[in-house]
Amino acid sequence: MSLEMFDKEIFDLTNKELERQCEGLEMIASENFTLPEVMEVMGSILTNKYAEGYPGKRYYGGCEFVDEIETLAIERCKKLFNCKFANVQPNSGSQANQGVYAALINPGDKILGMDLSHGGHLTHGAKVSSSGKMYESCFYGVELDGRIDYEKVREIAKKEKPKLIVCGASAYARVIDFAKFREIADEIGAYLFADIAHIAGLVVAGEHPSPFPYAHVVSSTTHKTLRGPRGGIIMTNDEELAKKINSAIFPGIQGGPLMHVIAAKAVGFKFNLSDEWKVYAKQVRTNAQVLANVLMDRKFKLVSDGTDNHLVLMSFLDREFSGKDADLALGNAGITANKNTVPGEIRSPFITSGLRLGTPALTARGFKEKEMEIVSNYIADILDDVNNEKLQENIKQELKKLASNFIIYERAMF
């Protein structure tokens, strides 16, 4: 029996989501479009298999084939990131980070991460996250120019003396200097942990410097700029740390791994290792630069005055409207983005004074410089007259026509 026959409610809602993804423009920086091949294996019989433990050391029988699958995923991950050890079992980026903390430090130890309002992530010590409850957290941020001042980070690190420094961000548009972070970590005897969830796809294509050999441990999601399934990974070059990480993930915070997702990670890594991937990642950056340049030409303020990666962060501190207003206006025009806090924030996290925009998903659809210039100017038009609902509707129809030339999926399920 087909899903349409068995559960028409879910079938219909899934197809409505397909329509939304195809007709609208996805510009949330952390979202992307994965491969049909990735979705195909995620919907396979591999979901039936319990495989607690690791390849060759399982707590269940019948794991001979899933052992081969997980080993293949591990080997591809190691090759992709040019590292010696990889754990592909984390169910998410947040759980990967949780596993890193559990492996490297003890509850109550101090961690130093980027302030959430300056572009960091919840799992880098934010008080509302378990990382800020189980561990004592302190923060560095960006300066008024929107960039990290590494001397300031050094001063904070020497004063606070954390056991672990987290580098990586969810809304930072500039290159991260991993070598400088390692210098600082070494000066105070701390671990350096790089969370590259947002930039991993650029890193493996050579479009952003790698955290190896500087970071003791590296984590990432496998979706976002990697375009794989939703999940997490942890990498290191240190055998002893690898053992601790493995124990922290299982049996520490997870039970049976999701073998259908691990297989999908392996498929995604195969794509990431291809020459086609390098072309894609380069275009992601090029498109982001077009977006940044058009918005600045149209007199909008960008945090750090541009971008080096896949995203731009707009600041509305000089405008009457908020990030939430901008988010809603773009949404009405068929562009999905997200409100975001900015340095010098004056509004609540639910309102914000910023907007984060990314190019990975549009690039996956085939958008290049010409299309990005059109989209960027429409964004500026909308934000120049943020309450004009008629304009938003007109632009929505124009963008719908544009999107129809770049259909990425013909059906909702594979």
Swiss-Prot record:
<feature type="binding site">
    <location>
        <begin position="120"/>
        <end position="122"/>
    </location>
    <ligand>
        <name>(6S)-5,6,7,8-tetrahydrofolate</name>
    </ligand>
</feature>
<dbReference type="InterPro" id="IPR001085">
    <property type="entry name" value="Ser_HO-MeTrfase"/>
</dbReference>
<feature type="binding site">
    <location>
        <position position="240"/>
    </location>
    <ligand>
        <name>(6S)-5,6,7,8-tetrahydrofolate</name>
    </ligand>
</feature>
<dbReference type="InterPro" id="IPR015421">
    <property type="entry name" value="PyrdxlP-dep_Trfase_major"/>
</dbReference>
<feature type="binding site">
    <location>
        <position position="116"/>
    </location>
    <ligand>
        <name>(6S)-5,6,7,8-tetrahydrofolate</name>
    </ligand>
</feature>
<dbReference type="GO" id="GO:0035999">
    <property type="term" value="P:tetrahydrofolate interconversion"/>
</dbReference>
<dbReference type="InterPro" id="IPR015422">
    <property type="entry name" value="PyrdxlP-dep_Trfase_small"/>
</dbReference>
<comment type="similarity">
    <text>Belongs to the SHMT family.</text>
</comment>
<dbReference type="InterPro" id="IPR049943">
    <property type="entry name" value="Ser_HO-MeTrfase-like"/>
</dbReference>
<dbReference type="GO" id="GO:0005829">
    <property type="term" value="C:cytosol"/>
</dbReference>
<dbReference type="GO" id="GO:0030170">
    <property type="term" value="F:pyridoxal phosphate binding"/>
</dbReference>
<comment type="pathway">
    <text>Amino-acid biosynthesis; glycine biosynthesis; glycine from L-serine: step 1/1.</text>
</comment>
<dbReference type="InterPro" id="IPR039429">
    <property type="entry name" value="SHMT-like_dom"/>
</dbReference>
<dbReference type="GO" id="GO:0019264">
    <property type="term" value="P:glycine biosynthetic process from serine"/>
</dbReference>
<keyword id="KW-0028">Amino-acid biosynthesis</keyword>
<feature type="modified residue" description="N6-(pyridoxal phosphate)lysine">
    <location>
        <position position="224"/>
    </location>
</feature>
<comment type="subunit">
    <text>Homodimer.</text>
</comment>
<keyword id="KW-0963">Cytoplasm</keyword>
<keyword id="KW-0554">One-carbon metabolism</keyword>
<dbReference type="InterPro" id="IPR019798">
    <property type="entry name" value="Ser_HO-MeTrfase_PLP_BS"/>
</dbReference>
<protein>
    <recommendedName>
        <fullName>Serine hydroxymethyltransferase</fullName>
        <ecNumber>2.1.2.1</ecNumber>
    </recommendedName>
</protein>
<comment type="function">
    <text>Catalyzes the reversible interconversion of serine and glycine with tetrahydrofolate (THF) serving as the one-carbon carrier. This reaction serves as the major source of one-carbon groups required for the biosynthesis of purines, thymidylate, methionine, and other important biomolecules. Also exhibits THF-independent aldolase activity toward beta-hydroxyamino acids, producing glycine and aldehydes, via a retro-aldol mechanism.</text>
</comment>
<keyword id="KW-0663">Pyridoxal phosphate</keyword>
<dbReference type="Pfam" id="PF00464">
    <property type="entry name" value="SHMT"/>
</dbReference>
<dbReference type="GO" id="GO:0004372">
    <property type="term" value="F:glycine hydroxymethyltransferase activity"/>
</dbReference>
<dbReference type="InterPro" id="IPR015424">
    <property type="entry name" value="PyrdxlP-dep_Trfase"/>
</dbReference>
<keyword id="KW-0808">Transferase</keyword>
<comment type="pathway">
    <text>One-carbon metabolism; tetrahydrofolate interconversion.</text>
</comment>
<feature type="site" description="Plays an important role in substrate specificity">
    <location>
        <position position="223"/>
    </location>
</feature>
<feature type="binding site">
    <location>
        <begin position="348"/>
        <end position="350"/>
    </location>
    <ligand>
        <name>(6S)-5,6,7,8-tetrahydrofolate</name>
    </ligand>
</feature>
